[in-house]
Each structure stands twice: as C-alpha cells, then as structure tokens.
Amino acid sequence: MSEVIIDFSTFENRLLALRDRFPSFDGSPSSLVFILGSADEENPYQKTTILHNWLLGYEFPTTLIAVFKEGCVVITSAAKTRYLEEGVAQMNKKLENTFKIELWQSSKEPGHNLKLFEDLVERVREAGSAVGLATKDSYQGKFITEWKGVWDTAVEKHGLNGVDVSLGLSSLWAVKDEKEQAYLQVSSRGSDKFMNLLSDELVRAVDEEIKITDAKLSDNVENEIDKSRFLKKLSPELTPLCPKGEKFDVNYLDWAYSPIIQSGPKYDLRVSARSSETQLDGNGCILASCGIRYKNYCSNISRTFLIDPSDEMTDNYDFLLLLQEEIINNLLRVGATPKQIYDGAVNYINSKKPELSAGFTKNVGSLMGLEFRDSQFVLNNKNDYRKVENGDCFNISLGFNNLKDSKTGASYALQLADTVQLTSGGPKVLTNYTKSRSQISFYFNNEDDGTTKVKSEESKTASIPTKPDPKSKILRSKLRGESRAEDDEKEQIRKENQRKLHEKLQREGLLRFTDTDAADKDQKPVVHFKKYESYVRETQIPNTVRDLRIHVDWKNQTFILPIYGRPVPFHINSYKNGSKNEEGEYTYIRLNFHSPGTGGVSKKTEELPYEDSPDHQFVRSLTLRSKDGDRMADIFKQITELKKESTKREQERKVLADVVEQAKLVENRTGRTKRLDQIFVRPSPDTKRVPGTVFIHENGIRYQSPLRTDSRIDILFSNVKNLFFQPCKGELIVIIHIHLKNPILMGKKKIQDVQFYREASDMAVDETGNGRRNQMKFRRYGDEDELEQEQEERRKRAALDKEFRYFAEAIAEASNGLVEVDHPFRDLGFQGVPSRSAVFCMPTRDCLIQLVEPPFLVVNLSEVEICILERVQFGLKNFDMVFVYKDFTKPVTHINTIPIEQLEFIKSWLTDVDIPYTVSTINLNWATIMKSLQDDPHQFFLDGGWSFLATGSDDEMSGTSEEEVSEYEVSDEDPSDEEVDSEDDYSEGDNEEFSDEGSEDFSGEESEEGEDWDELEKKAAKADRGNRFAD
C-alpha cells in the first residue's frame, strides 16, 4: 500500500452524509459498526468492503469502523494508521467539536485488541441499544474471531440489538456524485472495449471453425486484462473520461466478473450465469456478457450475436431492441418504482408480442455502482418500496429465454444489457458497443436453410434451384441476371465511395498547400559555400616539400605544387580534372580546378560551389612539365586516385545522409531474456550463411551472430515502423520482418528492412531401388511413408508458426505499445512485379507487403495519396499499379504485370482501405508529373488536382468501344505484355460463356462445328467395316 492516496475531502463529505442519514435507517440505529477481516477477493461486493471503497477509495483489511452521532472510531493497524493520521488531524481541526474522528491502533499483542473492542462496546452501549450492522457480511481472520467473542458477550450482558442497515446503505449509495459518474463512464467504456475484443475472438472462432469451449474462450478474453499492450491502447481513450485532475491508471481496471459466453442449447440469463464447458456452437444465438470495474465502480454489457439466424430470430431480436428502448426512454423515469417499470415492460410485450411473455426475464436489471448488483433495488414486480432518483445508475438487463425456432425447432435465447446513468437531461446509456442487428448478425452459410425436396420418379423435368449453383450452366444462362444485378449494385456503391474519396483528396490538397509552396522558376537554387582547409598552420605542411617537387598528402587530401620556390597546397575538392601528355623530352600534366562561371557547369560542380565575388581570384588551370616522365606519370596517377577516393567518400556521405544515429541498446540484466534460436537474418552481417539468435532487451532487440561477438544488429523499438509476422503457409520460410522508420548502418551499407526467418521444411529425398542400404538410408521418405511424412511436415509447420508468432507478440509486448504485430492476408494476395521478378504481394491491416524475395516491398497505406492502375485495356492480360505518396518528394512505387483477373478485386480492396484510384490506358511519365507537382503543388490542386487522370476512369472506360481501344497502340517498356492472344489464351469457362449466351438463337450452328478426333476415328472404323462387307 505504498502508493495509497486518500481523498480526505471526499472522505469527510461522505462520512458526514453517513452520520446524518443513519438514524433514519430501518431499526433506527443509534450507532453503526462495520468490521472487515481478511480481504475476500472471491466476494468483493460485501457491504463493509463497499463502505471502505466509498469512504476511503481502498479496502482496509483487519479494520473496524464505528460511527456515532458525535464522532467516528477507526480501529486499524499502525501501518494503515499512517495513511490516515495526517488527513484525520486536519479534518478534526476543521470540524472542531461538531464531529471527531479517533484512530485506535490495533496490534498483535495478546489482549491488546480485546481491550480496544471492550472500550468500543462501552461507547456503543452508551449511544443506545440498537446497533446498525451489515448482518449478511461474512469475513474470516483472527481479528474477526476476537471481535465476535466480545460482541456476543456484550449482546448477552448489555442487551445490545443488531439491526441490518443494508437497505439504508443502498439508498445512501444510490445517487452518484460527479466523481462517481466519471468512474462509471470509464468502466463502461472499458466494458465496450472488452466486448469488442470478445466479439472479434468469437466471430473468428466461428468463422474458422475452431474447436474451443465457451469457458476456454471466456478465459482467453479474461486474460487480456493482464497484457500491458492491450491496456496501453485503452489509456488514450479512457483518460479524458476520468474526473478532473486525475489520470487513468490501468492498475485500477479489473473484471467485475469473468466474461460469460453461452452458445446453447441451454441458456441462463441471470447475472450469476457461467460460461459452459461445452463446445462453442456456431449456429443460432450466442450470448456474451462483459463487466469491467474501475476504482471498484462496476459496469455491465450483454449482447446477442446472431449466426445464420432465421427470420423469426431476427424479428424477435428487433422487438427486444424496441423493448429496451421503451424501458430506458419511457419507463425508467425519476419517481417510478421498480414494480411500475417491470409491469410496464410486461404490458408492452403483451400488447405487441404476447407469445414472448412466457420467456421474459424475471427482472429488467438492478441498481449498480460499487456493488455490481444491489439486491435492495432490483427492477422486478415485487419491489415497490424504492423509487428511481436522479443520479442513480442501473444495469438494464432483459431478454427472452426458452425460445424455439418454428422452422428448425432449435432452442435459442436473446439478451441485451447496458449500463444506464440517470442525469438531469434524462437517461444516458454509458455502454455504446453496437447492438444494431446488421452489426451483430453474421452469415457464414449462404445456402438455403430448408432441405432440398427429393425429385419424384414420375417427374422428368428438373426443377431450377432457388440459389444458382456455381457448377451449373444455368448460372450462365437463365440466372445470369441475378449475379449481374448484384455485381452492378456493388459497382455503383464502389463508384460512389470513390467519388467521395476523390472529393476529399481534392479538399485536403487545397488546404495542405498554399502559394508559398510553389518554387520560383527564375530563382536559382540556394547554394552554400562549402569550406575546406588543407592545413590550419604552416607547421602542418610536410617537411618533404623542401625539395620543391610535387607531393601528394593522402592524409590531408591535398597535393602540393612548387610555385615560385614556395610549396602551395591544393585541396582535392578544388581539383576538377586533368590530363597528361608527352611532347619531345618533356612530360606535361594539366590540372583543371573548379571556379565559378566556368562554362558547362554540371550538377556535380554545383555541389562544390564557391563564393562568387569580384574581389576573389581563382586559378582555373595549371600546367607543369618535367623531363622525369616516370615521376610525372606517378604523380598524375596519385592525384587521380586521390580524386576517386574523395568522390567515393562524398557519394557514401550522401547515401548515408538520412541515417540517424541510434541510442544505445539497453540490455536486459534482470530476469530471463526472451530469445529465438537458429534464426537466419536478411541482410546478414556475415559473409557466411549461419543461424544466429535474436534477443529481446529493454528498449529493443538484438540479433547476435555466432561467428563474432561484434557481428550483430541492434534495433530499437522507437525505430520500428512496422512489425510483420508471416506464417509459412504456402511458403518455404516463416518470417518476422521489421520495417524501420530510419535506416541503420550494417557495416557501410544502409538498410531499411531487417528480416528474421527460418526454413519451414527439410529436404525430402526419395529414391527408388530395392537395395537394403538404400531402404535403410531413405526409409522415412519412401512411398509407403508418404502420408506420415506429410502429417509430420504439417505438424512442424504449425509448431514453427506458433513459435514465431509468440515471439513476435513478445516483441510487441516488450515495446510497451510502441510496436504492433501485423499479419498478411494471404487470401487477398495477388501476383505482381514490384522489382525484378514476379512475386506474391499481400495486404495487411496497414500495408501492402512482399517479404519472401529481396528486395522487399512495404507500402504503408496511410502514406499513400492515390493509386493509379495503368495499361488497363481490352485484350491485355495484365496491368500495372502505381502508388503516389503524400510526400511528393518520395519516389512512386510501381507494381507491374498484375493479372487482369485481379483488377476488380484490387479496385474493391483500394476502396475498402479508403485509397482513391484512377484507371489509365497507358503508362504515365511519373518523373515529369512529380516534378511539376513539386514545383507548384498549390496550383496543381487549383487546376483540378488528380482529376487530369480521370480520362481513364471507370466511367469513361465503360463507354469506350472495342474498336477505339484496338486502334491505340500502347507504348510499353515490356512489349511481351502486348503479344496477340492465341486460341489457348482463352479459358474453357470463357468459351462456355460465349456459347451459352447464344445457345437459344444459334443452336443450329452446333452441327456445323468441327468434330473431334474420337468421332472421326469411329466414323472411319465404321466406314472400313462397311467397305469390307461390301467387298
């Protein structure tokens, strides 16, 4: 309890409120006594525990609180007294003689506590014989045992009478102040978040047909509250809901009860229900409930999830929504009694759907707050002694049980529960997780619910199925209009969404850029004089120059020329180029230098500018001659090599300009460091391909090579932009891939992506041969063990995926919310060529990736401005995709040669992730487009922005005739993409489709088609037999 902070202002207000109210409690008690023994985590809703939390904000075990009209006595240990004494002293000083709080210290000394209890009993007896108690509370411990002995003696000796004050306490706690209402909002939002998590896990289990029990699924959700990564996500959302001056503290967030999941066939709609141990049934109705408490203030939410529901289920669920709305908006009003509320709900059912009244719950909720379910204020037809007040908070829970589907006969139940706060403005629902039928209904089986009628033998006519069969030719003829209408509707929705995305893109572009963002075409780029020095002082010049010969100083990047008997240094950066030639007995070398205004100034020379001034004089060239030809050739070679070295070093500096120096990796010195062994890394710091180990440390991860201790890669969590886990399904390797915010150095190489992988399978060898030696050598890979081998392979792959997934999640958890694991969706992938070869690209939640073959592809979708689909033409088998980024200085990303069959899917995917796209029939010159855009982005958007690409949009492409497209000869860098399709290029399905469309009007043409070889051979054989008999 080292971090206990008690709000003594709240303590004072609530203690005085208790002092003022308790004489009017049932039984008219003259004093109150509440004793708490050892903490009971299994039952946190006992009245004495709630009183501690209401007064102090904490539960103080082994503590007794006695309240009188003139004061209060607290008996507790010396350790707990330290948290109270300073605040209590200030309260006593403030209250003076009107009310006094006394702190009595208990101890473990024999007889000490008995003496305190006897003194207290004497005070109680003096106050009066009626003593208010929480008679239903049950605590254990030595402190309780000692008190019971003294109390029982006092009852017999002094005639003290204990009266139950549970109802009085309930009425005192019913109305919530602003602080309590804020805590209820925090806990309710927490319930929403955990219900969202529960629904995701539930739907995934049903969709993937995972074999799991209701209780096990409940445990999985319950354990999420212990994961810091999940809790840190909650902090930004829950902090604004906290009372003024308080910060959200995850340590005070806890379950009010274990999550409840019920998938039938039996349901329990009581708050005491438990998740069953039966397998999760993914049909019909699944009931789910979550309850979170923050600083001991409880909230509750229950939802019904409909899985492939019948019309009757959905109709009854819609009525349940209306019933809950009726209770909250019309029946739950200030001054109403629980009986009036419940009877009003029953009357509503009888007037609308009387057949449901038999299965209606026995109550529609209860008062809640520090106590999850206040038994003194249950909303049923028996409670007419309490009235709803402004400031009350209720768990409105209702449902129908023991329902039977008239079509299938299956049993099901429906339930809804929400936390509702009564405010001056009316009821306010604090739990906002969706309950709309469209959002909680899931359809995994699209086939007919009814059974197929058996066709009678007399009937020769086949009936048309109510749903088109994908394998039936009826799909492509009679029922073609059904699927086409559905596709047209989806297309219209997609076009409307794209129109909104383009309008949003144009608005944001105009807001993002102003006139000042434009570059002045007449203005030359501002250059900065690059200073360099060969020597600061003359004493640094080498002594060898005394011989008045040409010298090259490699250390200082300088060559020294003798001019008029003096050594003159020239830095290599001032040297431009040179030449050497021989004339007669002399060898000449000409040295050219950089200077401003030199004709033919290139981009490279501008990178080494000088300060241009009339006062400055420059040497543009020098010519030296000597009879020592070998010496001059050697000098010229050294100067040339020095220049090459300088240029190379400058280029490396430019390449590494965006490399940010990382902080040091803080190694984990305490506890066990998580590690993953036998890991290969790409790119590798070693020349040899050897497996190493990855460690998770305090602020990052480290890959350590086994060859050398200094051969390692350190990656800080703060520099991780994306963390991907890609399982080995459909691949030969399992991958953990890290995409960095800023590149890091590996030796002298700059890297932006680091990948850890392990091969998923060993080489399998199968040899034929009957030799005993061969059979022994390859006995596990023979034909007779093929099934066993495949099963073993699947098991290994599953274990490998599990190991890597756990390690990736461990990395994310160790980052304290800085990193999240992203997974690719293989079912949404497509083939493309982002670099040199065709690869399989897959979307993730936030990116489009290709991680199997280097160079890797990682496109962060949040950074994409627009996507352009190029070379979309009739007759072409593939198209290209270009991503333009919001940072216009960043090069665009190309993914070429995507199969044309993926076009509609990619359009839908781009729309789903809110990326606007346009369609073009040609490849665009992106270097020119991006340069003009960077020159004046404001004018670009004033002129319509990306609308200039709309000439190839879906609307226009749909109206383009086949002749118009065929007349255009596309200019493509890859002519192989535009070869004329042969007959083999058309699929069998396409031929069927064309023939089916014309089957009614041109059925007579089938006889004119050529016959296949089998038919011709049969005819030839028949003709031969006929000729033989004729002979």
Curated annotation (Swiss-Prot):
Keyword Transcription regulation: yes
Coiled-coil annotated residue ranges, if any: 478-499
Biased composition (Basic and acidic residues): 450-460, 491-501, 1016-1031
SMART domains, A to Z: FACT-Spt16_Nlob (SM01285), Rtt106 (SM01287), SPT16 (SM01286)
Pfam families linked to this entry: FACT-Spt16_Nlob, Peptidase_M24, PH_SPT16, Rttp106-like_middle, SPT16, SPT16_C
Entry annotated with the keyword Phosphoprotein: no
Record localization: Nucleus; Chromosome
Gene Ontology CC: one annotated term: FACT complex
Biological process (GO), any one: constitutive heterochromatin formation
Domain of life: Eukaryota
Region named Disordered: 450-501, 952-1031
Composition bias, Acidic residues: 953-1015
Alphabetized GO MF terms: histone binding; histone chaperone activity; nucleosome binding
Alphabetical UniProt keywords: Chromosome, Coiled coil, DNA damage, DNA repair, DNA replication, Nucleus, Transcription, Transcription regulation
Family recorded in the similarity comment: Belongs to the peptidase M24 family. SPT16 subfamily.
Function: Component of the FACT complex, a general chromatin factor that acts to reorganize nucleosomes. The FACT complex is involved in multiple processes that require DNA as a template such as mRNA elongation, DNA replication and DNA repair. During transcription elongation the FACT complex acts as a histone chaperone that both destabilizes and restores nucleosomal structure.
Subunit structure and binding partners: Forms a stable heterodimer with POB3. The SPT16-POB3 dimer weakly associates with multiple molecules of NHP6 to form the FACT complex.
Protein name stated in the entry: FACT complex subunit SPT16
Organism the protein comes from: Eremothecium gossypii (strain ATCC 10895 / CBS 109.51 / FGSC 9923 / NRRL Y-1056)
Organism lineage string: Eukaryota, Fungi, Dikarya, Ascomycota, Saccharomycotina
Gene name per UniProt: SPT16
